[in-house]
């Protein structure tokens, strides 16, 4: 099936458009309810891969607000969609080797939770973004654009590197693009040593 890797970029460029990519089924349901109540256009991307649910039933989704899933101060890993689960797994693996990564679920790409991004930059000093999207125009670029003008810190983007989407099982596609917890761990170790 078709793999769209540029939808966030296209939707972010439309004035007034809200762009959301929930991390699990509970958040997806809450995001649909929030989108229904929102007075304006909303683009809501749903992934095809089932991921474990880590939000509690009754979770209240707030457009434009991210959430810290795991505390840490060595580095912040900001993710959305199914990559949030991969980032959480990476955070656990990094903790086991003494790296304390803050994991952030940033389901709203536009408007970006600039307050939380700034907090991560100030408290962690380095940021990695993770998304199932092109590194051009998505979450990583939104974070970089904001920080370049407010509080420049090193940022590494993990995503699809300027390629068209490919077909295969979800696991095959994620592996082909390096969108896995294992890859996040390796990138984090290298990035922290720069």
Can you say where each PLM-predicted feature lies in the sequence?
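Glycine- and acidic-residue-enriched helix-capping/beta->alpha junction motif
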Residues: 35-41, 143
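Conserved thiamine diphosphate
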Residues: 1-37, 192
């Amino acid at each position: 099936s078709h793999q769209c890797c540029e939808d966030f970029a296209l939707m972010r460029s439309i004035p007034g458009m809200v762009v959301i990519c929930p991390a699990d089924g509970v958040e997806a349901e809450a995001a649909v309810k929030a989108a229904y109540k929102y007075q304006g256009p909303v683009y809501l991307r749903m992934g095809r891969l089932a991921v474990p649910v880590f939000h509690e039933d009754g979770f209240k989704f707030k457009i434009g607000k991210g959430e810290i899933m795991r505390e840490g101060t060595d580095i912040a890993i900001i993710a959305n969609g199914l990559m949030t689960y991969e980032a959480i797994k990476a955070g656990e693996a990094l903790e086991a080797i003494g790296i304390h990564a803050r994991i952030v679920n940033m389901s709203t790409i536009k408007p970006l939770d600039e307050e939380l991004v700034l907090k991560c930059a100030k408290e962690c000093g380095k940021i990695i973004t993770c998304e199932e999207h092109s590194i051009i125009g998505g979450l990583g670029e939104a974070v970089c654009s904001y920080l370049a003008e407010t509080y420049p810190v090193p940022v590494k983007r993990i995503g699809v590197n300027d390629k068209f989407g490919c077909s295969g099982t979800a696991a095959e596609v994620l592996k082909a693009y390096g969108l896995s917890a294992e890859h996040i761990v390796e990138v984090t170790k290298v990035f922290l040593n720069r």
